[in-house]
Amino acid sequence: NQTSDDCALIKAINEKLLINNDSLVENVHFNDFTICPHDLGWKAVISNISDLISSGSHKTIGITISLILPVKTEWEWVEELYKGIDKALKKYGGIILGGDCSLGNVKTISITALGIQGELELHRSACKPGEIILTTGIHGLSKLGFMIQSKLNSYNNVSLSERLIKKSIDHFCRPRLYPNILKKLLKTRPNKKIKKIGCTDSSDGLFQALQDLA
């Protein structure tokens, strides 16, 4: 880790770096009633690594974290947030390279993640008409989990099983990644010369993902 320096030095000889940034803002993406700080830390990391994987990354180098917090934020909240961040990095790879902290009116977690591009180059623009679309995970569960946690009335007239409620909340608070999907794509190529494939992250919903690929 290089958290004591102003910059992180990364060796990338003969490698292509993938870089992305994602932010979670209080009262826009989360609040203390919908998700605990530990799960929020996990989710913040997963959101970024998911973008890396959907762009062809086969290895996450690390992340930088910019944290903006109100002055009244309790230290225990910060510790739990970083425990969630650490747990996600240990499971999916990468280290904390550095970051920044500042005061603000609402809690904001902004993460920049760096990964190394693998054999496949994945771009939204590479999707072609007539191609088969593959998806990972179960779409809609995270949205339902958010609605349940937010106590929205939209689902009140629908009978939901305890199992579905638990699974939906879990998908919202602790989303999963499918890092082996790229290896499986490599094995299914009809032509080994194929390097570019259309792909996008679908955390904003299946419909939005399809629009991005169209």
For the regions a language model picked out, list residue spans one by one.
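Helix-biased detector of long, well-ordered alpha-helical tracts
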Residues: 1-214
